[in-house]
Amino acid sequence: HETDPDGHVLNSLMLIVMKFQREFSNLKDAFMTVHKARSFGSGSERLYVTNKEVGNFEGLGEICRQAGGRIPSPQLKNQNKAFANVLERHNKEAYLVVGNSANFTNWAEGQPKKADGTCVKADTHGLWHSTSCDDNLLVVCEFYFIL
């Protein structure tokens, strides 16, 4: 190019881009190390985290979305165990979402009972129960990272 006949500007820009690529790669590696360490103990790629507050089902969805997560929806036994570990630590129950095509369920004996409510909660053992959507339960959000 006429304003940069020797390509110095282009070379400088290429060096800057390469530096950002290295920094991004390092950041991604660090993030994945933390994620793997957090999920190591539970054997689940999904993280279940509480802010130690309580709330109803409607409020939970918004809280989880704002935090970058979602309402828990364990799809495998190890995910349900990781979720139950949080509940056991805090000795509280929490809401979860059961998908229509769920291959995994963990209903307590005699459940689900629509008469008990249209939402689902997990107890400290990870067993699922029908419940009212207005109950104030422990706020737990699910975070699932795909890189």
Swiss-Prot record:
Keyword Glycoprotein: yes
Post-translational modification: Glycosylated.
InterPro entries per UniProt: C-type_lectin-like (IPR001304), C-type_lectin-like/link_sf (IPR016186), C-type_lectin_CS (IPR018378), CTDL_fold (IPR016187)
Covalent S-S links between cysteines: C64-C141, C119-C133
GO molecular function, a single term: phospholipase A2 inhibitor activity
Positions bearing carbohydrate: N103
Protein localization: Secreted
Tissue expression per record: Expressed by the liver.
Function summary: Inhibits the enzymatic activity of the acidic phospholipase A2 (PLA2).
Record family assignment: Belongs to the alpha-type phospholipase A2 inhibitor family.
Protein name as annotated: Phospholipase A2 inhibitor subunit A
Source organism per UniProt: Gloydius brevicaudus siniticus
